[in-house]
Amino acid sequence: MIPVSLVVVVVGGWTVVYLTDLVLKSSVYFKHSYEDWLENNGLSISPFHIRWQTAVFNRAFYSWGRRKARMLYQWFNFGMVFGVIAMFSSFFLLGKTLMQTLAQMMADSPSSYSSSSSSSSSSSSSSSSSSSSSSSLHNEQVLQVVVPGINLPVNQLTYFFTAVLISGVVHEIGHGIAAIREQVRFNGFGIFLFIIYPGAFVDLFTTHLQLISPVQQLRIFCAGIWHNFVLALLGILALVLLPVILLPFYYTGVGVLITEVAEDSPAIGPRGLFVGDLVTHLQDCPVTNVQDWNECLDTIAYEPQIGYCISASTLQQLSFPVRAYKRLDGSTECCNNHSLTDVCFSYRNNFNKRLHTCLPARKAVEATQVCRTNKDCKKSSSSSFCIIPSLETHTRLIKVKHPPQIDMLYVGHPLHLHYTVSITSFIPRFNFLSIDLPVVVETFVKYLISLSGALAIVNAVPCFALDGQWILNSFLDATLTSVIGDNDVKDLIGFFILLGGSVLLAANVTLGLWMVTAR
């Protein structure tokens, strides 16, 4: 559910803004001066919407649009080709997304894991950035509805809205420069806030826009999504090169650094994980970076519980008579004292008979090699057994190595460890450096990639009121005018394509919202 406090703040804030605006406009003393102030500053206020427009940046836009004319011509030609391809590809992408959503709705147990754009999704900002790289732990769709407070953590709103605003500004800069390049008058640039979503816009002289050729219009209309696509590519490049960029201050490849442990995490405790710990192994799985951490947890979660070699003498010394019984899930329990330190283990004796024994977990698994069967233990000692923790179906005992501290023994679902422990691959070279800085940068870049890419895809959809509508109209004018002489037929074709795109997008948004809010 959306946090009530967030709703109260948003609704309360807009109520104050709107009532203040209404009172000032109704006041005999302040009406004219207030309206003059709004007009002079390019401000307009309506319910849940604030809009600011300025001509301050016009000179900069004209400078950019008239510089290196030949290069810009080729640049926006590439953008035009990309825009047309993206417009038609969006049908396939939306159709695929709709099928995925319907498949999830039909499933008995829809996947409970979702991301941002790219996202990415977890309980804290740093865990989101570090864990979103694991595709195996998530059944992600290319497009997904994002609702703050539901599948977008409230503590990541700053990343989200900053990335939305930057993506919107870059999008509109593309339209503005392309328009000036095609000799369309540029009136101004602006920013708006709708409820909680920020955005940008450019004001172009409509008459000029209608007088230029369809191909010129295409360059202008495609420029926005083209710039968003390029921004997403630059974000991917920055993400790949981040270890190199931060190399003078941070190093990687030796493990993962703990940046945060949630208060409700099972990893909290005197012998648990702490901020600043360097994890090098999960069981016998080496961890050198975030991807290794995710893959190791994935393997541990979906493979049978691993065992530990123990000598016959140690087993005899530590074990004591117990009465085993079956749990509801069919697994066996043999520790009847509900101890936090003892765990029920199963093993096969020399006669291949399965036995159960209750052992102090730390003494049983410390300084031992891992195994699957007794044969794995015979290599080191002929009188050894492979003892395997007898736990509930989805529960695992995981030995987490974080030297120089003593190994942490974690008992629980691997995904709980995944979602309640925040990590980073970047280890500071100097003590004064923040361990959170690389995580903040990484998280923001991932949001920028996801949201800029999403803005390019969604705006390319031939849908009423989106860039795709104008791209489609210009494309039909450029290609069908000489083929179909009757403009009414051409307009009818365009209308049905727009109707199909609008219905497809609306279906995705509606079902996506239902899937997000119904979970």
UniProtKB/Swiss-Prot annotation:
Instruction: Give, from the UniProt record, the effect of changing residue 87 to I.
Output: In IFAP1; does not affect subcellular localization; impairs activity
Q: Where does Zn(2+) bind?
A: 171, 175
Q: How does it sit in the membrane?
A: Multi-pass membrane protein
Q: Where is this region: Disordered?
A: 115-135
Identify the GO cellular component terms for this protein: cytoplasm; Golgi membrane; membrane
Segments in the Lumenal topological domain: 25-74, 108-144, 252-446, 477-492
Phenotypic consequence of residue 171 to F: Loss of activity
Its UniProt entry gives the catalysed reaction(s) as: Cleaves several transcription factors that are type-2 transmembrane proteins within membrane-spanning domains. Known substrates include sterol regulatory element-binding protein (SREBP) -1, SREBP-2 and forms of the transcriptional activator ATF6. SREBP-2 is cleaved at the site 477-DRSRILL-|-CVLTFLCLSFNPLTSLLQWGGA-505. The residues Asn-Pro, 11 residues distal to the site of cleavage in the membrane-spanning domain, are important for cleavage by S2P endopeptidase. Replacement of either of these residues does not prevent cleavage, but there is no cleavage if both of these residues are replaced
Gene Ontology BP terms: ATF6-mediated unfolded protein response; bone maturation; cholesterol metabolic process; endoplasmic reticulum unfolded protein response; membrane protein intracellular domain proteolysis; mitotic G2 DNA damage checkpoint signaling; positive regulation of cholesterol biosynthetic process; positive regulation of transcription by RNA polymerase II
Q: Residues on the Cytoplasmic side?
A: 1-3, 514-519
Consequence the record notes for mutating residue 175 to F: Loss of activity
**Cofactor(s) this protein cannot do without:** Zn(2+)
Instruction: Give the result of residue 172 to D, as annotated.
Output: Partial loss of activity
Please list the residues that make up the active site.
172
Give TM segment ranges.
Answer: 4-24, 75-95, 96-107, 145-169, 174-186, 187-209, 229-251, 447-464, 465-476, 493-513
Q: Entry's Pfam families?
A: Peptidase_M50 (PF02163)
Q: Which UniProt keywords apply?
A: Cholesterol metabolism, Cytoplasm, Disease variant, Glycoprotein, Golgi apparatus, Hydrolase, Ichthyosis, Lipid metabolism, Membrane, Metal-binding, Metalloprotease, Osteogenesis imperfecta, Palmoplantar keratoderma, Protease, Steroid metabolism, Sterol metabolism, Transmembrane, Transmembrane helix, Zinc
| Compartment list | Membrane; Cytoplasm; Golgi apparatus membrane
Report the outcome of residue 459 to S. Answer: In OI19; decreased regulated intramembrane proteolysis resulting in reduced transcriptional activation of genes relevant to osteoblast differentiation and bone formation
- The EC designation for this entry is 3.4.24.85
In this protein, the residues bearing a glycan are 337
What domain of life does the UniProt record list for this protein's source? Eukaryota
What exactly does this protein do?
Answer: Zinc metalloprotease that mediates intramembrane proteolysis of proteins such as ATF6, ATF6B, SREBF1/SREBP1 and SREBF2/SREBP2. Catalyzes the second step in the proteolytic activation of the sterol regulatory element-binding proteins (SREBPs) SREBF1/SREBP1 and SREBF2/SREBP2: cleaves SREBPs within the first transmembrane segment, thereby releasing the N-terminal segment with a portion of the transmembrane segment attached. Mature N-terminal SREBP fragments shuttle to the nucleus and activate gene transcription.
The disease this record links to the protein is: IFAP syndrome 1, with or without Bresheck syndrome: An X-linked syndrome characterized by a peculiar triad of follicular ichthyosis, total or subtotal atrichia, and photophobia of varying degree. Histopathologically, the epidermal granular layer is generally well-preserved or thickened at the infundibulum. Hair follicles are poorly developed and tend to be surrounded by an inflammatory infiltrate. A subgroup of patients is described with lamellar rather than follicular ichthyosis. Olmsted syndrome, X-linked: A rare congenital disorder characterized by bilateral mutilating palmoplantar keratoderma and periorificial keratotic plaques with severe itching at all lesions. Diffuse alopecia, constriction of digits, and onychodystrophy have also been reported. Infections and squamous cell carcinomas can arise on the keratotic areas. The digital constriction may progress to autoamputation of fingers and toes.
- Which family is this protein grouped under? Belongs to the peptidase M50A family.
The protein in question is named Membrane-bound transcription factor site-2 protease
Instruction: Say which species the protein is native to.
Output: Homo sapiens
